[in-house]
Regions:
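Active-site loop-to-helix "anion-binding N-cap" substructures in soluble metabolic enzymes
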Residues: 1-379
Length: 379
């Protein structure tokens, strides 16, 4: 995989460069971008190309509904630098705007998924996108596990490179595939069936794996503890997973009654009316020595239902990691949109925790397979 900075300024000046970014960002109630984390991470590549004199054509999808407009993203990006929004993808307006570009200009195309051919990896759509540019750059790690036209189709048609975000993600997560020892993985999530493969993989590679979030309920239930009305998966964890000596499950939990009052309890004390919403202080204390000794931590998934305000124990673990990182000798890779959102609410700066991955599903798939379709497509 070649990175775009392997080309000289002379090789980029005047060239039309199609940058596949991932600007699928959350929107607030006012219809504007609520979190610019991904925008700031993706802007580095775009700004670099612009300064090299390239004509930068940025493409991304947003949301799940194909009719959703990417215009709010354009407004947010304008706070980072000069950008022209084109409400078109490969039609006359897009072609005309690209033809009128000057060296250093940046344009943002409309939501790629407005064209149904994008998700179908349609060859004709890939050709139309490729016709806009001379060079292709994939900087969209978070969707590199998708086989969409802009991810795997266009690279077949143009000289293709990784952007800086993609390069950094691959480097960081490659280290997480074979972490220095001692190592710790913290894995959360809502559905055990989606996390089962990565937990099994981590149990073979990491010294200890701690399960948190709703998937911890599945492990508690698998070990015979009551879980009340807590969320559990249809796919129950296998006995060999629950009883693996390297697996850490919560030693206490925060349980919410139907009247919304929450209490810290031991797992065996959960009542039928209780809903587990987070871990507890004893679990944090259990993790503390593992974090203190670790040289590498991978973390994907908050400890509790953060959207309902249960972030105190996510924050407590983050504080332990931040202190250990500051002391030196620990590197931490953190991923998953919910994890990062919860950590931002904790107020601990990103640089004090380690590397924040933009990928959720892509991060886990890379850690499971060591590659992704969008990375393979870059050659």
């Amino acid at each position: 995989m070649k990175c775009i900075d392997e080309l000289s300024a002379g090789e980029l000046k005047g060239k039309r460069v199609l940058v596949r970014s991932d600007f699928n960002v959350p929107m607030g109630a006012d219809g504007e971008v609520a979190d610019i984390f991904r925008l700031k991470r993706g802007w580095e590549t775009i700004q670099y190309l612009s300064k090299q004199g390239a004509r930068v054509i940025v493409a991304s999808h947003i949301g799940r509904a194909p009719e959703e407009s990417i215009e709010p993203v354009a407004r947010a990006l304008k706070k980072l630098g000069a950008i022209i929004y084109i409400p078109d993808i490969v039609g006359p307006a897009a072609k005309g705007a690209v033809a009128a570009m000057q060296d250093g200009d940046i344009v943002l195309l409309q939501n790629l998924r407005r064209d149904p051919r994008e998700k179908k990896n349609d060859e004709s759509f890939a050709r139309e996108l490729a016709s806009l540019a001379d060079i292709y750059v994939n900087d969209a790690f978070a969707v590199a596990h998708r086989e969409d036209a802009s991810i795997v189709g266009v690279p077949k048609l143009l000289p293709s490179y990784a952007g800086f975000l993609m390069r950094d993600e691959v480097a960081q997560l490659t280290e997480a595939l074979h972490p220095p020892r001692p190592s710790l993985a913290i894995v959360g999530g809502a559905k055990f069936e989606t996390k089962d493969p990565i937990i099994r993989s981590f149990l073979e590679v990491y010294d200890h794996v701690c399960v948190v979030g709703a998937i911890a309920n599945d492990c508690l239930k698998g070990k015979g503890f009551p879980v009340g009305r807590s969320r559990v998966s249809e796919h129950a964890p296998a006995r060999e997973v629950c009883e693996n000596p390297h697996l850490i499950i919560p030693t206490d939990v925060t349980a919410e009654r139907s009247d919304k009052q929450a209490f810290v309890k031991k797992p065996q004390d959960i009542l039928p009316d209780d809903k587990i919403v987070d871990i507890g202080p004893d679990t944090v204390a259990t993790l503390a020595p593992y974090i203190a000794e670790a040289k590498f931590v991978t973390w994907n998934g908050p400890t509790g239902i953060f959207e309902e305000g249960y972030i105190s124990y996510t924050s407590a673990i983050a504080e332990l990691i931040a202190k250990r990182v500051e002391k030196g000798g620990l590197h931490c890779v953190i991923g998953g949109g919910d994890t990062i959102s919860a950590l931002k609410e904790s107020g601990i700066p990103e640089e004090k925790l380690g590397f924040f991955s933009t990928g959720g599903g892509a991060m886990l798939e890379f850690l499971l397979k060591g590659n992704l379709p969008g990375i393979s497509a870059l050659g």
